[in-house]
Design a protein with these regions (language model features):
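Conserved alpha/beta-hydrolase
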Residues: 43-61
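Catalytic histidine neighborhood in serine/cysteine hydrolases
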Residues: 50, 207, 211-229
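Gly/Ala-rich beta-loop-alpha elbow adjacent to hydrolase catalytic centers
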Residues: 94-98, 102
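Active-site nucleophile loop of the alpha/beta-hydrolase fold
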Residues: 117-126
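Active-site nucleophile elbow and catalytic-triad environment of alpha/beta-hydrolase enzymes
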Residues: 165-183, 188
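Short beta-strand/loop motif that positions the catalytic acidic residue
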Residues: 186, 192-194, 198
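Conserved alpha/beta-hydrolase "acid-adjacent" motif
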Residues: 199-205
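Catalytic active-site module of serine/aspartate enzymes centered on a nucleophile-bearing elbow/loop
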Residues: 225-255
Length: 255
C-alpha cells in the first residue's frame, strides 16, 4: 500500500498576470498536475492564476488521512482571499472534489467571485459502501484501492494517490450533505462541464447541481469523449477554450 515518490505535477502553481484572477482546485486524492495544462492555457490568456496543492496531497496517502475537508477549504479560502485582494475580478474552477470546494466557496463568499467553472463536481454518491461502510471502515483499514486515471485517452497518467485514504474520504462524505443543502445559496454565473461516462462521480451529480443552485446564468456543456479526469482527456481543449470564453463573458464591464 505505497504510492510512488511524487514527481512532476505534485506542486502548487502560481502566476501573476492581469486583473482577472482564476483559482483552480484539484480533486481528491489528486494533485495540481491534473489541472496544469488548464492553468497554462489561462496564463496564455493573460490571467492571474493560482493552483494550490491541497494539504495531505502530493506526498503520501498517509498524509491525507491526517487532513480533512475543512483543511482543504481553509487552503482554497486563503487563495481566494489573496486573489480577491490582488485582482478586480475572480473566477473559481474545480475538478471533482475540487468542484465541491468551489461550490462551498460560492456558498460562503458569493460576493468574492464573478463566476464558477465546474468539471464533474461531486455533491453526493449512490455507492452504498461510501454511504454506510465509511463511518466504520475508517476505524478498520487506513486505505483501499481507488480509481486513478479514469481517462479515456490512452497513455495519459493522472498524478495522485492510487489508494483512497479512508479517514480523509470520510470527511468528504460528511461534507457532501452540507454542500448540497446550501446549493440554493450559489448565485454566481456557472459553467458546468460534465462527462457522459464517468466511473468515479455519478453523472447525476451534475444534474443535482444544475437543478438546485440559484444561479440565473448556467452554461451546460457535456463532455462526450472523456471520462472523469476530463481536464487530461479528449475534451480538455473544449474545457480550456470554453472556460476562457465564460471568464471573458462574466468579467466584462468589471475591469
Amino acid at each position: 500500500m505505497t504510492d510512488p515518490t511524487p514527481a512532476q505535477g505534485y506542486t502548487a502553481f502560481s502566476h501573476d498576470g492581469g486583473d482577472v484572477g482564476v483559482l483552480l482546485i484539484h480533486g481528491f486524492p489528486g494533485a495540481p498536475g491534473s489541472l496544469q495544462a488548464w492553468a497554462d492555457h489561462l496564463v496564455r490568456a493573460g490571467y492571474t492564476v493560482r493552483l494550490p496543492l491541497l494539504p495531505g496531497h502530493g506526498t503520501r496517502w498517509q498524509d491525507a488521512n491526517r487532513t480533512t475537508f475543512a483543511d482543504w477549504l481553509g487552503t482554497v479560502t486563503a487563495s481566494l482571499q489573496e486573489l480577491s485582494a490582488r485582482c478586480r475580478a475572480v473566477v473559481v474552477c474545480g475538478l471533482s472534489m475540487g468542484g465541491t470546494l468551489t461550490l462551498r466557496l460560492a456558498e460562503l463568499f458569493p460576493d468574492a467571485m464573478s463566476g464558477i467553472v465546474l468539471v464533474n463536481p461531486s455533491v453526493m454518491t449512490l455507492r452504498k459502501d461510501a454511504k454506510y461502510l465509511l463511518p466504520v471502515l475508517r476505524y478498520v483499514v487506513p486505505a483501499y484501492p481507488g480509481i486513478v486515471g479514469d481517462i479515456a485517452k490512452p497513455d495519459v497518467v493522472e498524478p495522485g494517490y492510487k489508494w483512497i485514504p479512508v479517514k480523509a474520504m470520510y470527511t468528504v462524505s460528511r461534507a457532501w450533505p452540507v454542500v448540497r443543502a446550501e446549493l440554493p445559496k450559489v448565485t454566481a454565473p456557472m459553467l458546468l462541464l460534465h462527462s457522459t461516462v464517468d466511473h468515479v462521480v455519478e453523472p447525476v451529480n451534475a444534474q443535482i447541481v444544475r437543478d438546485e443552485v440559484s444561479s440565473q446564468q448556467i452554461t451546460d456543456i457535456p463532455l462526450p469523449r472523456s471520462y472523469h479526469v476530463a481536464t487530461m482527456d479528449y475534451d480538455a481543449e473544449l474545457i480550456f477554450t470554453s472556460s476562457v470564453e465564460f471568464i471573458e463573458k462574466v468579467t466584462v464591464g468589471l475591469l
